Amino acid sequence: AYGKDNNIYKFVTQLEIVGNEKRIPDGIVYINGLPLVVFEFKSAIREEATIFDAFKQLTVRYRRDIPELFKYNAFCIISDGINNKAGSFFAPYEFFYAWRRVAGLAKEVDGIDSMFTLTQGMFHKNRLRDIIRNFIYIPDSSKKNEKIVCRYPQYYAARALYENIKKAQKPEGDGKGGTYFGATGCGKSFTMLYLTRLLMKSEYFKSPTIVLITDRTDLDDQLSAQFVNAKTFIGDNTVESVESRADLRDKLQGRQSGGVFLTTIHKFTEDTELLTDRSNVICISDEAHRSQVNLDQKIKLSEKGVKKTFGFAKYLHDSLPNATYVGFTGTPIDATL
């Protein structure tokens, strides 16, 4: 999945750097001579020194005295050997997170074990270059310095869904790309964004069209604002909220590839007319358990006679029959997709 690695990696400790003042960062990871990761360590046994002090050292003193070091910085690590966290140079302290898992490990770890998962997980060479390439989001228009580094659940989820979509794509696959269950606050919208980038940048998919469906308009506004502000990151200038079903049909039929379209599930009801039968369409549905469970037919009796209605999923699958479907949910449920 990662391709050939011709990069040169060096880990340098205690390098004196002279800027406005002389500073000596504890560790720097150089890739091809570029200082991409800076480490700051504190002692676990000295009670007065915490990793918050390491954070301040990086973001106050180093920023003031050796700002040149951070021109190429991807992210930073603060650690006392027991508490080990990664974060963007511009992020507040509470947005530094532990990397608690490596591929193949059954459970998440904490404490001293999280140093192992950080080095084996985040700093596995293939994963490190994947993170630098695909999992650091810089918004298109940002008034302040803003850079968002993925957290480990977002990384592993986006990668797993990407591989699953590959297998599920029609005609060879069954179109079921899988469901991601993420607890509230896990940064689900970023997982969607990272997944979208992987799909759009992938040589395998050759610029697919992505339809992002939510079932709440308030969330849709938040999500669409985030996506519309990520055109550079996604790699496609067409990232649009769709006003109506007819609007979506026009947009889908006017292209053979590319484009990210955000819509709400309610725009799909009452009509099962084909939107497109292309198989290079990936449908990402938020709160999947609510919107897609009911393929069932319902019958309503009215003065005009019997009227058949269907659950949202029926409309969806009839409208995009060859798409691959991926669901995101905060509530585990058996019948998603």
Describe the residue ranges of each PLM region:
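A short beta-strand-to-loop transition that corresponds to the Sensor-1 phosphate-sensing loop
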Residues: 81-82, 216, 263-267, 287, ...
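Conserved helicase motor
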Residues: 217, 239-249, 265-270
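Structural beta-sheet core signal
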Residues: 38, 76-78, 212, 283, ...
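Conserved motor-coupling elements within RecA-like helicase/translocase cores
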Residues: 243-261, 274-278
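ATP-dependent helicase/translocase motor core
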Residues: 1-209, 218-234, 256-260, 296-299
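Signature of the SF2 helicase/ATPase Hel1-core->accessory helical subdomain module
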Residues: 51, 97, 270, 276-337
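Hydrophobic alpha-helical scaffolding
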Residues: 147-151, 185-186, 213, 217, ...
